[in-house]
Amino acid sequence: MATNKPANLNDLQKAINDISKDALKYLTDNKASVTTFHDQIGYAGYDAATLIGILKDKGGATLAQDVVKMIVMRYVRGTGFVKDVTKKTKATAGSEEAAALVARYGLVSSVGSNANAITLGRVAQLFPNVSFEVTKQFTGLKMAIDSSDLSMSGTDSLLWDFVPQYITLDSSSAPYCTTKSVAHILFSIHVIHAFLVTKKTMPEAKKKERGLLKDIDIIKYTTGLLVITCQSKNLNEAKKKSGRTKVCEPYCVNEKFKESFLALLASFGKNVVCSYGTQVKQFLAEQCSLMKTIVDNSSKTQDEMKALIIEFFEEE
């Protein structure tokens, strides 16, 4: 049992805030060494309180810098890097330090049946503000599914797996988003992104084991997980709003989305959302008002879709 486990929600939020603050300071003060670590390793529903406790128990005085390096590992090499590190027989630059982190925190490449398993992905999502700065600082980071796959080229920064931590839902049941908000747009995008990532990366044997044989099965599964993440109370509402603002800043003017971004959203709607079969589209229409608007107007041209989306966000 983790001896440093936060006792309540306030303590959990404070612990995340404190460690994030220290980790961000380390990232700012040690950009050169973090960049070196990045270069060395690079190629050309869990209980947050328990995980925080385990990290604090194992990390001690080096926890903040370790969090930064684990997050760098996650976004430079992916969650499977843990398995790569443990298989290495020949030491390379950065590998010994990465291996030490794997050993110290008992990092694993996938959760399996261990609810308290520590993966690079979980660390990154537990400290979204640190993850945001890491992904902002380094260029050329790869995604399994990027913005071009969503017909929204140039918006990769919206798709990182920590972004759902910033999303606030309007309802605890579908439709989850009904207001004309930034969170509504992020939720809509991540419903599709999570579906496509799982469809591409989950091994076929695991899909079969979980009964994820059709697109409708996969998207119901991934949307359920997304909703759980969005409902997380790891961050208070002020932190969530601040995170949304930071993530969306390149695409906004005076807290309103640029028309050029709404054009990309229309492209996403017409070329991706509307491309799915009837079952999937019907499911999507039930998840939020924006998806319903897109699905209900599947026959429209992309320009007509753009006009509808602009109107949708100007109604309130």
Swiss-Prot record:
- Record's keyword terms, sorted: Capsid protein, Helical capsid protein, Host cytoplasm, RNA-binding, Viral nucleoprotein, Virion
Q: Please tell me where RNA binds in this chain.
A: 43, 46, 76, 122, 240
Principal location: virion
GO terms for molecular function, please?
RNA binding
GO CC terms for this protein?
A: helical viral capsid; host cell cytoplasm; viral nucleocapsid
Pfam families, per the entry = Tenui_N
Q: Which InterPro entries match?
A: Capsid_Phlebovir/Tenuivir, Nucleocapsid_Tenuivirus
**Location in or out of the cell:** Virion; Host cytoplasm
Q: State the family it belongs to.
A: Belongs to the tenuiviruses nucleocapsid protein family.
Its function?
Encapsidates the genome, protecting it from nucleases. The encapsidated genomic RNA is termed the nucleocapsid (NC), and serves as template for viral transcription and replication.
UniProt free text on domains: The N-terminus is involved in homooligomerization.
Q: What is this protein called?
A: Nucleoprotein
The organism is Maize stripe virus
| Lineage of origin | Viruses, Riboviria, Orthornavirae, Negarnaviricota, Polyploviricotina
